[in-house]
From Swiss-Prot:
Keywords: Cell cycle, Cell division, Chaperone, Cytoplasm, Isomerase, Rotamase. Its EC number is 5.2.1.8. Consists of 3 domains; the N-terminus binds the ribosome, the middle domain has PPIase activity, while the C-terminus has intrinsic chaperone activity on its own. InterPro entries: GreA/GreB_C_sf, Trig_fac, Trigger_fac_C, Trigger_fac_C_sf, Trigger_fac_ribosome-bd_bac, Trigger_fac_ribosome-bd_sf, Trigger_fact/SurA_dom_sf. Residues 158-233 form the PPIase FKBP-type domain. It holds the Pfam family Trigger_C. The keyword Iron does not apply. It is found in: Cytoplasm. It comes from the Bacteria. GO terms for cellular component: cytoplasm. This is Trigger factor. Its main location: cytoplasm. Involved in protein export. Acts as a chaperone by maintaining the newly synthesized protein in an open conformation. Functions as a peptidyl-prolyl cis-trans isomerase.
Amino acid sequence: MEKNVVKAEKNVEIVEFTFGPDEIAEAENEIVRYVNKNYTIPGFRKGKAPKRIIETFFGENFRDMVLEELSRKIEDTLKDEELFIPAVIADRKIEGDVAVFVVELHREPKVELKDYTGLELSVPKQEEVLANYVDNKLEELRNEAAIVEPKDGPAEIGDVINIEYTIEKDGKIIADHKTQEILIVEDDDRPIVTNVIGKKKGDIVEFDRTFENSNNKYHYKIEIKEVLKRTLMELNDEFAKSVASEVNTLEELKKKLEEEGLEAFESWKKDFLRQQVQDKLAELVELEISEKTLDYFVNRAIENAKKENTYDSYLKQAGSEEKLYEEFKTGILNELKKNTAIEKIAEKEQIEVTDEEVMKTAEELSTYWGISPERAKEIVKTREDIRNDIVENIRRTKVQDLIVEKATIKEISADEPVEEQKEEEEKEEAGSENSENKE
């Protein structure tokens, strides 16, 4: 077998393997031995069929079987090669007395890691967030403590209504005399809400509606069983004492809520900054990666989408197979860059994940898994795939936190978009301008 590198493109080597007549004959004999051992050829005792008869019996398939046997020899030759993805046999054929295989060897792409210090991140101003938190919590407490009493007049924004409804589809009842309590709020534009505003106890409302992406028509019949007026308490010391026994004044309640909000804000801020780092990771590396490697990942993703019956919905959203292919490719390249950035930064900063950290995470996950901490630890010890996922998650978080520590963090007003949102808006504006120019 001769091996010859005929072309190199970024991380991919195109290698030609050539087998001579003796090697082809050896592969043919191997196939003959296999067939005689596992099959019975009509007219011959098992194991006694001659080569020419087996060739005739299998026809063109015999040649394919020989090529498969030679493919296995190539796989054996490459088993110790360090490859990014499995070797891809792009072409194989027998020409005369030689067999030629064209094989793509995908090496790990070369990586250029950029400077990850001083990354620009942003968070909303703490005082604004806390002020909004306190205001929202106070309003929430007012709603929870609202005084509710029957009302004779029509239902209005802020009222509570008790309804009984029946739904028909194609003349068949699919919901019969169901009851529901609804708080009427200004932004709720559901027909079941908008159609009862202004109605009184005992009124009956009927209407038809359809739902998005469906041609089915549903007929609703609603009876107003009761209208309840909600009266919200004034924000004063009496209100504060009624909703929190440990405080005596409204200011004390606000202070308590602010402390709660600060704790929640610090936890949220940590995750918020980590997510910003995650979104920027792809910008921190340059990958010298071939289109052939990306095509491999895209085709595999498409195959998985078809198996999971999600391909058609993806295709509908994309609009065409070409656009969907490019969307897959962009997403895959982005993820490859992010994962590579995590890996290279962890190597450079000598970030390690200890067994203690893995077991601690297993304990924390036990609640979500619905099992004991001891059982969770045992699973992590015996399931290498789960352990690897945990290790990768811990490593990713450590890298994110390190980048945050080295970042430049800017406080912005709560209504000011963060950097990623600005970039998206700029892209949308550019896209709109391009569309207008085309028109």
